[in-house]
Curated annotation (Swiss-Prot):
Signal peptide: none
Coiled coil: none
Assembly with partners or alone: A double ring-shaped homohexamer of HslV is capped on each side by a ring-shaped HslU homohexamer. The assembly of the HslU/HslV complex is dependent on binding of ATP.
UniProt protein name: ATP-dependent protease ATPase subunit HslU
InterPro entries for the chain: AAA+_ATPase, ATP-dep_Clp_protease_ClpX, ATPase_AAA_core, Clp_ATPase_C, HslU, P-loop_NTPase
Organism, scientific name: Aliivibrio salmonicida (strain LFI1238) (Vibrio salmonicida (strain LFI1238))
An individual GO BP term: protein unfolding
Function of the molecule: ATPase subunit of a proteasome-like degradation complex; this subunit has chaperone activity. The binding of ATP and its subsequent hydrolysis by HslU are essential for unfolding of protein substrates subsequently hydrolyzed by HslV. HslU recognizes the N-terminal part of its protein substrates and unfolds these before they are guided to HslV for hydrolysis.
Residues that coordinate or bind ATP: I18, G60, V61, G62, K63, T64, E65, D257, E322, R394
Family matches, as NCBIfam families: hslU (TIGR00390), PRK05201.1 (NF003544)
Keywords in alphabetical order: ATP-binding, Chaperone, Cytoplasm, Nucleotide-binding, Stress response
GO terms for cellular component: HslUV protease complex
Gene: hslU
Presence of the UniProt keyword Cytoplasm in the record: yes
């Protein structure tokens, strides 16, 4: 798991997300507390439960982006789900328990990758030996057995050197690789994914053990395939499973987006089964329960739950009281200003302007955004948000695409040309649309 300090986490988030300091600090502290808890004595560690977070803010201000970036920083099992995808137990649709099953699958895959990475050097050496055995078959005695000899002879060492330098990469050889198991693809109705997995596992077991298949491959491809095969042999599946379940129980993070969509609004008279029932099903997961997965039983007592919602049609108090109590940390994200839009266009790593400059540079078209041009784009997006529906920073994508449409279309024929995107250019391309509210409502 990540050992970054809260300050380092916030600094990393700052390079991708503009503003929202309170939300960044909250998730940074929550992530660091995961590490702090693991430093405690086992008796005290069992008593320390994570403080779950509820992020509240209008659409397009960075709630989902914080989750995306956090997933990369966490170095722990992480899953992001939409609350609207789930229905109450007993109705057709996905049950909330599938969140934990999917998170466990993520942990298994992650732990397997880490284990294979640790034995990567040994696996690559063994893969090299197998390829050298094909290129330089060992001498055999009259009985067909390999003769005892110096495997690291001068010729073998010479070939190993060439292999490592890539001089043999394009040579084709016949190599025995593990044949993929013949699986049975089963299309299951929603909510029956677990049963489908069990059936598929049963059919795979019936198909027998692992078989090999002779294939003609380039040496560089054979090295990769054989290294994966040897790496899989060097790891213990049972130990992996135990480690993955430990990781998911102690370091797992669940991000539930759009939680406001399963609130029953104060004025709502609907008895929608996918709302309050889903909240009640989420309760046991958030407060701690045991979920059955194909890898074993998984406890959710020490998982961190981060939830978010716009809460435009409902209020946080519309959540059922029990769930409100399980989300003690409330963070309100602020609506973005025109100045924030300006910073979003220039400051983050791989900002929108950088992306367009790089994309059109592939066609040998040089794009330059001036300070007044960027200010005008930001003001235009902010103005459209104010006069129509406020969709936050996502409006910048729409405005930029409209602005760059003509040059993107003609770029192939304009190799070597330059374009300066200044105030005048932005006004000529977007002026009429922004001034005319009816047009901007449908086009921007």
């Amino acid at each position: 798991m990540s050992e970054m300090t809260p300050r380092e986490i916030v600094h990393e988030l700052d390079s991708h997300i503009i503003g929202q300091d309170k939300a960044k600090r909250s998730v940074a502290i929550a992530l660091r507390n995961r590490w702090r808890r693991m430093q405690l004595q086992p008796e005290l560690r069992a008593e320390v439960t994570p403080k779950n977070i509820l992020m509240i803010g209008p659409t397009g201000v960075g709630k989902t982006e914080i989750a995306r970036r956090l997933a990369k920083l966490a170095n722990a099992p992480f899953i992001k789900v939409e609350a609207t995808k789930f229905t109450e137990v007993g109705y057709v649709g996905k049950e909330v328990d599938s969140i934990i099953r999917d998170l466990t699958d993520v942990a298994i895959k992650m732990t397997h990758q880490q284990a294979v990475e640790k034995v990567k050097f040994r696996a690559e050496e063994q893969a090299e030996d197998r390829i050298l055995d094909i290129l330089l078959p060992p001498a055999r005695d009259a009985w067909g057995k390999n003769e005892e000899g110096d495997n690291d002879s001068g010729t073998r060492q010479s070939f190993r050197k060439k292999l490592r330098e890539g001089k043999l990469d394009d040579k084709e050889i016949d190599v025995d690789v593990a044949a993929p198991q013949v699986g049975v693809e089963i299309m299951a109705p929603p909510g029956m994914e677990e049963m489908t997995n069990q059936l598929q596992g049963m059919f795979q077991n019936l198909s027998g053990g692992e078989t090999t298949k002779k294939r003609k491959m380039k040496i560089k491809d054979a090295l990769k395939a054989l290294a994966e095969e040897e790496g899989a042999k060097l790891v213990n599946p049972e130990e992996l499973k135990e480690q993955a379940i430990f990781n998911v129980e102690n370091h797992g993070i669940v991000f539930i987006d759009e939680i406001d969509k399963i609130c029953k609004g104060s004025n709502s008279q609907s008895g929608d089964v996918s709302r309050e029932g889903v909240q009640r099903d989420l309760l046991p997961l958030v407060e701690g329960s045991t979920v059955s997965t194909k890898h074993g039983m998984v406890r959710t007592d020490h998982m961190l739950f981060i939830t978010s919602g716009a809460f435009q049609m409902a209020k946080p108090s519309d959540l059922i009281p029990e769930l409100q109590g399980r989300l003690p940390i409330r963070v309100e994200l602020e609506a973005l200003t025109a100045n924030d839009f300006k910073r979003i266009l220039t400051e983050p790593n791989a900002s929108l302007t950088e992306q367009y400059i790089a994309l059109l540079a592939t066609e040998n078209v040089n794009i330059e955004f001036t300070e007044d041009g960027i200010s005008r784009i930001a003001e235009s997006a902010f103005r459209v948000n104010e006069t129509t529906e406020n969709i936050g920073a996502r409006r910048l994508h729409t405005v930029m695409e409209r602005l760059m449409e003509e040059i993107s279309y003609d770029a192939s024929e304009k190799g070597g040309d330059s374009l300066t995107v200044d105030d005048a250019y932005v006004t000529s391309r977007l002026g009429e649309l922004i001034e005319n509210e009816d047009l901007s409502r449908f086009i921007l």
